[in-house]
Curated annotation (Swiss-Prot):
Gene3D superfamilies: Allene oxide cyclase-like. Belongs to the plant dirigent protein family. The lineage of its organism: Eukaryota, Viridiplantae, Streptophyta, Embryophyta, Tracheophyta. Homodimer. GO terms for biological process: phenylpropanoid biosynthetic process. This is Dirigent protein 2. Keywords: Apoplast, Glycoprotein, Secreted, Signal. Dirigent proteins impart stereoselectivity on the phenoxy radical-coupling reaction, yielding optically active lignans from two molecules of coniferyl alcohol in the biosynthesis of lignans, flavonolignans, and alkaloids and thus plays a central role in plant secondary metabolism. Pfam families: Dirigent. Disulfide bonds: none annotated. Residues 1-27 form the signal peptide. It is found in: Secreted, Extracellular space, Apoplast. GO terms for cellular component: apoplast. It comes from Arabidopsis thaliana (Mouse-ear cress). Glycans are attached at residues 70, 111, 128.
Length: 185
């Protein structure tokens, strides 16, 4: 058995080396530039984002914090995971159009600023089943904040654009935020 293996070892080594060299030499040939692609649609979305931290059924929960967080006046180091409803109107009972699923972290040491990583997953209407990926800085005490749209799925493939967030209402730690999202796709 060992002799057979020793006889096959050079053959297996050769096959492995050839497969590695073929893989490396073809790495760029599998990716072709997208020639002449131009986004053909522009979409403006308007909805309200409900971030609920308090109560029996929170939609955002703290999953981590740094040891120094309690000594920070801006909660630096806190990480939250969220599955927040997106609705047509500012009232939490208005029609739900999707969910903001992702996380945000308090990443500034001198002010309250989040780094937001969210998929806006649409569950109703024309864009049901589609998502938009949003990633960026959200300095929550600024009147209007802008975050980039970096991709999407379904109707929003190849999406790019930006989202503008404006705080509508804050009660304790819970917030309702108005969003205007401008997407080329």
């Amino acid at each position: 058995m060992a002799k057979r293996f020793l006889l096959l070892l050079p053959l297996l080594s050769t096959i492995l080396l050839l497969s590695v060299s073929v893989t490396e030499s073809e790495a760029y040939s599998t990716t072709k530039p997208c020639q002449g692609y131009k986004p053909d649609k522009f979409t403006h979305l308007h909805f309200y984002f409900h971030d609920v931290i308090s109560g029996d059924k929170p939609t955002a929960v703290k999953v981590a914090e740094a040891r120094r967080t309690n000594s920070s006046n801006v909660n630096f180091g806190v990480i939250m995971i969220a599955d927040d409803p997106l609705t047509e109107g500012p009232d939490p009972s208005s029609k739900e159009v999707g969910r903001a699923q992702g996380m945000y972290a308090l990443t500034a040491m001198k002010n309250i600023s989040f780094t937001m990583v969210f998929n806006l997953a649409f569950t109703a209407g024309e864009f049901n089943g589609s998502t938009v990926a949003m990633y960026g800085r959200n300095e929550i005490f600024s009147k209007v904040r802008e975050m980039p749209i970096i991709g999407g799925t379904g109707a929003f493939r190849f999406a790019r654009g930006y989202a503008q967030a404006k705080t509508y209402k804050v009660v304790g730690l819970d917030a309702v935020v108005e969003y205007n999202v401008f997407i080329w796709h």
